[in-house]
Amino acid sequence: MSVLISQSVINYVEEENIPALKALLEKCKDVDERNECGQTPLMLAAEQGNVEIVKELLKNGANCNLEDLDNWTALISASKEGHIHIVEELLKSGASLEHRDMGGWTALMWACYKGRTDVVELLLSHGANPSVTGLYSVYPIIWAAGRGHADIVHLLLQNGAKVNCSDKYGTTPLVWAARKGHLECVKHLLAMGADVDQEGANSMTALIVAVKGGYTQSVKEILKRNPNVNLTDKDGNTALMIASKEGHIEIVQDLLDAGTYVNIPDRSGDTVLIGAVRGGHVEIVRALLQKYADIDIRGQDNKTALYWAVEKGNATMVRDILQCNPDTEICTKDGETPLIKATKMRNIEVVELLLDKGAKVSAVDKKGDTPLHVAIRGRSRRLAELLLRNPKDGRLLYRPNKAGETPYNIDCSHQKSILTQIFGARHLSPTETDGDMLGYDLYSSALADILSEPTMQPPICVGLYAQWGSGKSFLLKKLEDEMKTFAGQQTEPLFQFSWLIVFLTLLLCGGLGLVFAFTVDTNLAIAISLSFLALIYIFFIVIYFGGRREGESWNWAWALSTRLARHIGYLELLFKLMFVNPPELPEQTTKALPVRFLFTDYNRLSSVGGETSLAEMIATLSDACEREFGFLATRLFRVFRTEESQGKKKWKKTCCLPSFVIFLFIVGCIIAGITLLAIFRVDPKHLTVNAILISIASVVGLAFVLNCRTWWQVLDSLLNSQRKRLHSAASKLHKLKSEGFMKVLKCEVELMARMAKTIDSFTQNQTRLVVIIDGLDACEQDKVLQMLDTVRVLFSKGPFIAIFASDPHIIIKAINQNLNSVLRDSNINGHDYMRNIVHLPVFLNSRGLSNARKFLVTSATNGDITCSDTTGTQEDTDRRVSQNSLGEMTKLGSKTALNRRDTYRRRQMQRTITRQMSFDLTKLLVTEDWFSDISPQTMRRLLNIVSVTGRLLRANQITFNWDRLASWINLTEQWPYRTSWLILYLEETEGLPDQMTLKTIYERISKNIPTTKDVEPLLEIDGDIRNFEVFLSSRTPVLVARDVKTFLPCTVNLDPKLREIIADVRAAREQINIGGLAYPPLPLHEGPPRPPSGYSQPASVCSSASFNGPFPGGVVSPQPHSSYYSGLSGPQHPFYNRPFFAPYLYTPRYYPGGSQHLISRSSVKTSLPRDQNNGLPCDSGFNKQRQAAVPATGSSLLLSSMTVDVVCEKLRQIEGLDQSMMPQYCTTIKKANINGRVLSQCNIDELKKEMAMNFGDWHLFRSMVLEMRSVESQVVPEDPRFLNENSSAPVPHGESARRSSHTELPLTELSSQTPYTLNFSFEELNTLGLDEGAPRHSNLSWQSQTRRTPSLSSLNSQDSSIEISKLTDKVQAEYRDAYREYIAQMSQLEGGTGSSTISGRSSPHSTYYIGQSSSGGSIHSTLEQERGKEGELKQEDGRKSFLMKRGDVIDYSSSGVSTNEASPLDPITEEDEKSDQSGSKLLPGKKSSERPSLFQTDLKLKGGGLRYQKLPSDEDESGTEESDNTPLLKDDKDKKAEGKAERVCKSPEHSAEPIRTFIKAKEYLSDALLDKKDSSDSGVRSNESSPNHSLHNEAADDSQLEKANLIELEDEGHSGKRGMPHSLSGLQDPIIARMSICSEDKKSPSECSLIASSPEESWPACQKAYNLNRTPSTVTLNNNTAPTNRANQNFDEIEGIRETSQVILRPGPSPNPTAVQNENLKSMAHKRSQRSSYTRLSKDASELHAASSESTGFGEERESIL
């Protein structure tokens, strides 16, 4: 019953059924019954938290201190659950406070653990013990602190709890609180004085656990109590170490601020820095480095912080550590340095950082691998590039590891070599050469690298060129040291067992036994010999294994092993020399054999010349051979050398038996005989033994007798060294003579070469004998050529490297003095001779190397420089072409001499070249005309130079392209003089765009370069000028100015003194001018450029190759032959030390008609051109040109000058673009910083990816970019022109007329012409523009695409110039009288009335007495309108006599035009420049009536096409003057003008005298004009040679007809005809008026003829130029035969015609002006498509008609006139 009742009570308590419980309790008084767990109803109610039930049970007498099975009481349960009211009731009922459960926990403990703050407070108020401990001695405060109950901690501390109490492991409440970051608990404990340094479990302090958990605030609180921050846990980790590993940056900073030690290692040895690096925490690493953490402490496995950073691949961290200068060579236990590790990880950035810091590439790991081994084994080209960027490290390619592998052989073992690509690497840090101020380290290292290349095939001759006394000998010593370090890196061989060892040991022990057998006893001898044999082999075994052991204790074994191996190898070599034929060496492309060098003692050759010095030189080389190969080997080789008759068998044979068999037989006989003697002695009893002994003695004696000669040779060779033989031969020089002595030297040299080759084949090495010739420039001059010939003869075969160190100018001068007449007559000079001998010229230019960094350039694809989209396309083609194999290019046959060899030779050459260079030579061997002169020897020389230059470029961190470098080297090698002109211009001219091609630059200065060797002897060193022009124009990639700036500092084959010579000569000319001559100094390139003209010749023909006339714009005309002034003294030519004078001292002075060629002179005044009738200023033409220049773009702003904002604005202006996408496009442009310069140079595909436009927008944007690029490519060369024209004074009228985009062809009627006056005296013409005091232009600008190409008619015009110069004073006086009278008559014509008669239209052509005019028009044919009034004031001066002396001859036709600011005479147009001088020179003294007027062709442009008017023929003009189609004078003025003109014509002084006088010079002129010769040496060419090789074949037939005298062109669409200008008509003689010269655009200037020009009667452009003196007059031209050819020839020029708006100029009040489009100016607007241009061209060309047959008589007329 009680059980049921009690269960019911418990059930009611569980169900919290209070009424039922009360009812039940009233019936039953037993309330302390238990359930199965021993719990009473009170415990259950206290646990459930039902206060009423608890009260009811307590009221009914429930015992509150009863325990269940786990020793829990009701108070403990209530405290655990936090029922405060029940706890209070239980305490009132007397519950026990200190009762413990089975775990020893009291009610307070549970309340603290559970965080029941109010319960804890209640219990403490009732006196609970706060220091009670439970299991593991844990206090309530520890539980409260560990679980973050801050209030309870505070209560406990207030009630006396121990603040520093600890549990069983010593962990205090502070440690527990800090472990979980309970900040408030930590604060309370610290406030009560908790010990911050007390260690708990695992030796952790509160600071350590707080740091480990990353509780920053707790750490800060603890640090405020000044703890010991350097305490460590059980693993040796400090708080800082833990924070660094975990990456708590703020905590680390706090700890560092608290003074924590940063270098305390943990138990493994890792420091805080290493821990931070391993964790990858960059900021922490930086913080530690700022606190001077030790970066070189080795941690676990000897790894430093730097190594760990490298291993983690964190480049930022590596960079930070490297800034603190760590030791980069500390190895790990595996021997790896950080560089080796970075190389293994292929981390290019880290490798580059380490190399920049000076990490050694020579470091090796435990396997002996260097970083190069690792990189090449891993096939990483970029890593290998970085590791090899210093030339000194190139020697590591040949350093073997412990397995015997070299990086070079590792690379050879792969099918695709990367070492051939490495030498196209990007940059090398020259930190190791900073101390070498002269840059010799780079020179020596690069040369040593080339000469140490295993695949380099000697012989080779290197020329070290520098001025005498510049330190070449110092470089030689450095070069020798470098070559030794490159070569002497082979590991010492270790001892190996071999059959030779067995044979030698047996022979030694047997001999020792025989000795003892003779002297002591046979048995003892056997015992001793066997014991000795055993000892020897025990010793060998110890040495064998000990030499391969690592450690210092075995160094003695290694030393003995290497010494034994060396001596045994030498013995083996001696036996091989005696008994074995040398094997063939393998091809160097499959296995690179190690190289060794032997040097001559070059000091003994200084200041010595002749046979004795050569003997001494070879003797020193033989001494070096003896030191290297050994005394016996070198001297015995003379006896045992292999004869060619031996064949390729392995063994040398004697009597058909191998020699070693006979040798072993003889040795065996000797040993057997000695053995028998030792055993049996000499006893007559032993007959058999005696017989055997006699036989043995006979065999041995016979062998000795038969080899007496050999023994004598051996004895002679051993006693007489090669040095002794050479000296004895030198002492007998008087008997041997020179030829005999040379034969002795040759034999000795060949013997040395064969010896080196033989020993190399046995030892598997490459020996190269280096002959150093120093002091050759100090030898006697007559010995120099002999020395060079001797060296060439002696060392032209075999493994020789000849190094000349000399001053090339002294040597070449000596050669020139000693060359025989045959060579001189063959145009072979000293320079050609040296070029033929020297395979690798190196000019020491330390200044260039020091400035190399200025030219450091970068590009995206290994040096591809993109100028524009077009250039980029060309380079893509280049890259595709360059991938062709060398085998394909050797199929070219006629273009290369390489394919004449057999297949094996060609394959060997192919492999050699491919291995030697990292670029394909296809482009050098393509069918270019310039290659026709390149021989295999020249190609080898080019390869050597390119290789050295490439290494120097890499050493200076200059990125380059191999194709461009090869083109540049070829240019400097074949044409050094002209290339020096290009370089000099680039050095002296600022502001040139980098993309300007060398062809454009050459066209600017071509007329400044002398063309004959008499003017400039240095022209001898250049190749054919025609090939030079073809190379510049047709070679791809096209070289630009940027390439010159890139390559020049490291170009070793170009003599820098050439530029000094050119500058000195130019300065000397100017100095002569300043010295008092009447001529102005001629600057190289001063004066503003002129605007382009449609009449200009294409750029390709504006060259000095075909230029044989006077030099325009600052360069003199060709001077007379050198014999003309050979006896004079003057400035010495720096190169040949010969008298050198400015040619204008001997030839007439020439001034070009263009205003751009002369220096600005203040003596010439100018004003705005005005119309004389209304005084209104005329347009200068420049603004019109600019307006027409960029009509489509709407702005003259160039693409490359646009900013990002301008590009965005330009984008918004594109029609058809999606406006909704515009903000996105603009954002992309700004984000990517796409400015105009980027657009002008970037790759289109990359731009497309970056812009991410939709299809339509992209094509619109792309077309805009390409269009602006095209515009800029036209504008870029003309930028200087714009600059100059903007800054110049108003342009003269003649310039403005020609610059305008459309020029009106003026009317021929004089009534509609504006009257001009021409009143210049001789004195005025002489001094015009020549004021010396005027300042020069400071802007060094050049003309761009247009060129002046006036020329003398003869290719060899010196003779004619001399004869013309020798005109007598009487002739000149007669001419002056005639000219003075002519001026007076012309003044009368124009002076009396205000008529429009033009005074100076007809030219006296006085200038042709001296053959210098380039203007076909009259001297006074043009006059600016602004000079009208001044001309009237100067009429009197114009009549003054001008006394001309012979040296003062002036070209009046051109001297009148001097500056850009003032041009009193009309500047000569492009027709004039291209006009042939021949025709004009033949007519020097004619009056205007007798002078043949130039035939005129009307040119009109219809839609951009060419239209020609028919020219009057004989039939048209054979009648009277009135029969002319268009009268030149109107009605009443006609007769007046004719009368006055007739008076002029009848002047005796003006007519007869000049003709009579000039007939004397007819034969000279005609000879000079007709006898043209084509000479490539003189730098000029005849009119048969055309620079346009691309059109050569198509125009082959037409080219024969283009030499005709006269061309008549007619246009069927035109019925009206126009007469000739009055200025050229004279008396309108129909025969004279019929004569015309048409210029050809594509011809060279030497073939050009003459045409007149004036601003009033603008002559139309003539499209063809012909030399009247070249073609027989009987040839008739039919232009219809080849219209297509002619169109092709004109295509280049015509395709550039753009659409322009018409501009009409009205020089006078003409009632009906005719506006005709002019082609003078090619506008820089949108190009028409080439296809349409070509179609138009073909159509127009087809309209050309045949010339009139009567015109063929012009040649006879010319002769009759003469």
Swiss-Prot record:
Could you list the residue ranges that cross the membrane? 509-529, 534-554, 669-689, 697-717
Region spans: Mediates interaction with CRKL: 1089-1092
| SMART domains the record matches | ANK
Q: What is the effect of changing S918A?
A: Loss of phosphorylation
Membrane topology summary? Multi-pass membrane protein
> Which positions does the record annotate as the modified residue Phosphothreonine?
T914, T1671, T1676
> In its UniProt record, which GO terms are filed under biological process?
cellular response to nerve growth factor stimulus; dendrite morphogenesis; in utero embryonic development; nerve growth factor signaling pathway; positive regulation of neuron projection development
Membrane side Extracellular: residue ranges: 530-533, 690-696
Please indicate the residue ranges that the annotation assigns to the motif PDZ-binding.
1757-1762
For this record, an example GO cellular component is: membrane
- UniProt topological domain (Cytoplasmic) ranges: 1-508, 555-668, 718-1680
Describe the function of this protein: Promotes a prolonged MAP-kinase signaling by neurotrophins through activation of a Rap1-dependent mechanism. Provides a docking site for the CRKL-C3G complex, resulting in Rap1-dependent sustained ERK activation. May play an important role in regulating postsynaptic signal transduction through the syntrophin-mediated localization of receptor tyrosine kinases such as EPHA4. In cooperation with SNTA1 can enhance EPHA4-induced JAK/STAT activation. Plays a role in nerve growth factor (NGF)-induced recruitment of RAPGEF2 to late endosomes and neurite outgrowth.
List, alphabetically, the PANTHER family matched.
KINASE D-INTERACTING SUBSTRATE OF 220 KDA
Name of the protein: Kinase D-interacting substrate of 220 kDa
Protein source organism: Rattus norvegicus (Rat)
Task: Provide the gene name from the record.
Answer: Kidins220
